[in-house]
């Protein structure tokens, strides 16, 4: 029987393992196919495509909003060289950085008040 794991996060998003370690562990455990679907990132795909002893399906988990709901959409067999995808990922990452900066600013104000 063939097994696959099609929803894995690496340390390029909110996972703890490198893409290399994920692939090595998948091979050791007999998986035939995997997809590293990092949040709003395709960086792990450049590492993953170097392996030919396991089927690595290029994937991503895109964040979006619909009617005040945060949604995550999984995409498989993505073209990591697609310029529109690259621009979208860059916008999402820029947005994330801005949110982090805003959170840090608010936390600094709270810490100052507590001092």
Placement of each model-derived feature along the sequence:
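An N-terminally biased module of ancient metal coordination in phosphate/nucleic-acid-related enzymes
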Residues: 1-70
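Extended substrate/RNA-proximal surfaces in nucleic-acid metabolism proteins
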Residues: 51-115
